[in-house]
Every structure is written in C-alpha cells, then in structure tokens.
Amino acid sequence: MDLMPTNHAELMAFLSEYKIFSAAIILLYSLVVTMIIMPRIVIISKKKNLTAQTNSRTSHKGVVPTLGGVGVFTGLILTVNFAAILFADYEQYVNLSIFNILTLLLLLVGITDDLMNTSPRKKFLYQLLISLVFIFGTNIHIDSFFGLLGIHDIPNVLASVFSAFVIVLLINAYNLIDGIDGLAGLVGVIVSGFMALAFYLSGNFFYSLISLSLVGALISFLIYNFSRRMKIFLGDTGSMVVGFVLAYQVVLYLSLANGNSEAFVFKNAPIFALALVSYPLFDTLRVMCLRLLNKKSPFLADRNHIHHRLIDLGLAHKYASLAVAFYTLLVTIVAVSINSLPINIAFIIMLVVVTCLLLLPFAICKKEGAWSLRFPKA
C-alpha cells in the first residue's frame, strides 16, 4: 500500500519509475478512446452517405464508411498529448505541437480526397509541403546512412531533402497497401510496436509512448475493420495520417540513433528500419516499375499488388493480411538477429530475404485447388 501515490508529485514519480505500467496505461487509453469514437463515425458516415464506392478493384460488398482515419487520428492525438503532459520535456512538447498541426493538415487533405477525389499531383504537393515544414520545423532528419553503401554523415540540406522524400514515399507506400481488410492496420501495429520497443530500449520513453498510442488506435480500428455490422475503412484519411506517423517514427529513430549510437540496441539502425517497412516499400516500387514498363501512369490504380495476388491464390482477406503481417514480423526478427554483422553484409542478406519472400506469391500457381511452385523458363 505504501507504493501507491497520494498526491500529484508522488503520482508523477510513480509513473516515471514504473514505466511499463505507464506504457500499458497509454496503450489502453488510446484503445478505449478510439473504441468509443469509431462507432459514432460509422453511424454519421452512413447517415451522410460518406461510404466507399464499389468498382472493378474493390472486393467489399454493401455500404462501408471510409473515414476510419478520423477515429484513429482522434484517439492518437488525444493520447499522445495526454502522454506529453506527463512525460515530455520542453523540446519534445514544441516538436509535438508542430506534429499535431501537420498531422491535422494531412487529415484534412485525406478527408478532402475521400469526399471529392483530389488529384494525385495535388496530394503529392500537399504531402511534400507538410513533410518539408516538419523537417525544417523540428530539425528531425536522417543525417547519416551509418556506413550503408559506404555513406556516413550527410550534409544538412541534403539530409533534410532526403528525409522529406522518405516521409512522402512512406506515406504513399502505406496508402497503396490499404487494399484489403486488416492489411494496413496489422502492418501499422507491427511497425509501431517494434518502434515502441526500439525507443524504449534506447532510453527514449516518451517517443515509445507515441508509438504505443498509434498501436492502441489501430487495434481499435481493426476490431471495426473486421466487423460485419459496424465495418469501416481507413480511407485516404487514415492511410495518409498513419503513413505519416510511421514515417515520423522511422526518421526520428534514425536521427536519434546517429546522435547517440552507443545507447541504441540495434547497431544497424537503417537495416532495422528498412525491414519494418520493407513490405510497403517493395510492393510500391514493384508496382510503379510495372506501370512504367507498360507505359502507364505510375499513379494509375490496378490489381498488381502483392495482396491482390494473395487473394487470387484463394486466401481470404484476413488470411492474406495475416500472411503479410507474419512476413513483416519475420523479416524484422531476421534484421535483429543479424544486427552484429557489418551493415553492408546485413543489407545484402536482408535484400535477398525480402526479395525471395515477397516474390514467392508470384511463383505459386493454383490449379484445381492445389498450389504448386512455378519458375520462369531460362
């Protein structure tokens, strides 16, 4: 009983000392807040007819609201700022204020797109502008490759431009994998969950709480995403916001790791980060290359994604999503297990593992209910 705090000062000391307990509270807070908000968004969206339209690429039936991202955003922002009151220092609070404003702007871009179909070019310009403001406003950027490909420190201007490019790339890559039930949500949970662990182990507790806030919000979203009666999609609203938050975590982690590498458990920080986001990056680059080879716009939507291939092989949405989630978990564990290797050797190993695993669905054919491997002829 003596351990229990009796006043505000003791409460703060208690929360700071028992960090696992505090982290669990933040995770639960985010989950509950989002759970409360999400059904209201479903009801309002149906009343206002803010729902997904079926087309040749969609596989859902019936009326499904597309503003799940509003619920995820609300749960995330309320939780992150609650955590900031308890644990953030002045610099973290200033950077969080910038993060809040820019995430809200990105949410508005997503809502506009979900309701009125913004052109890809306009979305790209908004994303680029928001990313540049974030990088220059917070001074959080990737300023080293840690020796990957022989590159170490990067000049400030180039580092800022490259970091903005990474953020825009990850926003769009995450947006493109949001094609079947559960996929974007599960990938987001795994990426943000590992980032929470990485921040915690490196002594950046507040940043781990940001990651856990997203985990809790996405778990709540997944419950409704898999529901039949109260089903909801992330929409561009959610995929852009979540993609931005995931990109923020990756850029922040690499920025911190370069400044204090001895405190970071994962010596090969870029390999760890690349493994986490390898699925959306690989899928996006593959699809873009195919479109360009076929002389089509790289922004033209189609059914050439890996998750579409898994569906064509007979997997239900949830099993296809679980397969990708398992892949993400597996390659991240591989990245951690080869952490002690020289970074370029680790990169080659990861490149081979990722390429083989993600091209495997295209080497499998299904005939008369049976699966078999097929290989290109010489």
Where are these regions (language model features)?
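Short aromatic-rich membrane-water interface segments that cap or initiate transmembrane helices
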Residues: 61-65, 149-160, 266-273
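Function-critical hydrophobic alpha-helical transmembrane segments in multi-pass membrane proteins
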Residues: 158-174, 183-184
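Membrane interface segments of multi-pass transport proteins and intramembrane proteases
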Residues: 145-154, 315, 341
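Hydrophobic alpha-helical hairpins/lids featuring a short glycine-rich hinge
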Residues: 97-129, 134
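Juxtamembrane helix-capping/reentrant segments at transmembrane boundaries
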Residues: 53-67
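Alpha-helical transmembrane segments
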Residues: 2-49, 73-88, 92-104, 108, ...
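Transmembrane alpha-helix boundary signature
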Residues: 78-93, 112-118, 135-149, 254-256
